[in-house]
Amino acid sequence: CIKNGNGCQPDGSQGNCCSRYCHKEPGWVAGYCR
């Protein structure tokens, strides 16, 4: 899984966060796990 602080996409296209939460705000190209 993707560790906290690393890049992710909410739709899971880049893998799943260990925390299961990908934080992404409007306008961001990518989010990050937290």
Swiss-Prot record:
The keyword Glycoprotein does not apply. One of its GO terms (cellular component) is extracellular region. One of its GO terms (biological process) is killing of cells of another organism. Keywords: Antimicrobial, Disulfide bond, Fungicide, Knottin, Secreted. It is found in: Secreted. Disulfide bonds join C1-C18, C8-C22, C17-C33. SUPFAM superfamilies: Gurmarin-like. It comes from the Eukaryota. It holds the Pfam family Antifungal_pept. Has antifungal activity against C.glabrata. Belongs to the AMP family. The presence of a 'disulfide through disulfide knot' structurally defines this protein as a knottin. This is Antimicrobial peptide Alo-1. It comes from Acrocinus longimanus (Giant harlequin beetle).
